[in-house]
Amino acid sequence: MAALLDGKTAVVTGAASGNGRAIARRFATAGADVVIADLQAEDRMGGDPTHEVIEGETDARAAFVECDVTDRDDLGAAVSRAEEFGGLDAMVNNAGIVGPQKPLTEVGYEGYRQLMDANLDGVYFGTQIAAAAMIDRGEGGSIINMSSVAGLEGTAGITPYSAAKGGVRLFTYAAAADLGPEGIRVNAIHPGAIETAMTTEDSPVFGTEQEEQMSAVTPLRRLGQPEDVANVVLFLASELSDFVTAESIAIDGGLVNTA
């Protein structure tokens, strides 16, 4: 049986570390060639660059492209690199930032704008540029947008992040309606607490009392790993989800719907 993504090519933004890294590696083990689009090639958790890991552990081709998702030219360059591999089949708009936790009244315009640019605008234009390439090719495709459980429910202290991630969810539905006739599926995922640099360094959950508290009230009694996210994204990128579009999938062990 052929691997799920044999002969496919994908772009994953923010793939040097965390969820994006796990997604890129999972795609490669499923047969896809992968473009790693990130600000830097180095893994924030100290591992070897993702493209080097992929080339060392699979037969897939991998390339790193320096990419700031707030720059449309950078996004275009990442998609162009995928076209050199044979054509873009899957786009994962994963890159994002959480920013400092502050009350709503203390959030400055620059801080707000930075979060919206990275978390919402980057997804919007990443989707737009990927869709244009897929339409030109005429073979459809799959676009997966990274939201968050913070885009499903209000969360104190991270209002710009919640606003951006909620925007990703509704934008995904609208994009799916626009692009469905072209054979392009668009879905959003909503990770909960997943062990990455974002949740161990930027906005610490893992290694704190909060980890124990959240695990205790999560139906599956644990928090997540990047591989949990990667497996869902693989499904959405593959033909197994051929009739799935305009969907949001929470990857949080059941917490958001049972808390």
PLM regions and their residue ranges:
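Short-chain dehydrogenase/reductase
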Residues: A2-G86, G99-P100, E110-G111, E201
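Short, small/polar-rich loop/turn modules that mediate ligand/substrate recognition or access, typified
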Residues: G87, G180, R185, V244-A246
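Short C-terminal tail/terminal secondary-structure segment
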Residues: V98-Q101, E153, A216-L220, L234, ...
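Substrate-binding pocket helix/loop in short-chain dehydrogenase/reductase
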Residues: K102-L104, G111-M116, M214
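Active-site helix of classical SDR
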Residues: T127, A164, T172
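Alpha-helical segment proximal to the catalytic Tyr-Lys
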Residues: A132, D136, A177-P181, D242
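Residue(s) in the substrate-gating loop at a strand-loop-helix junction
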Residues: S148
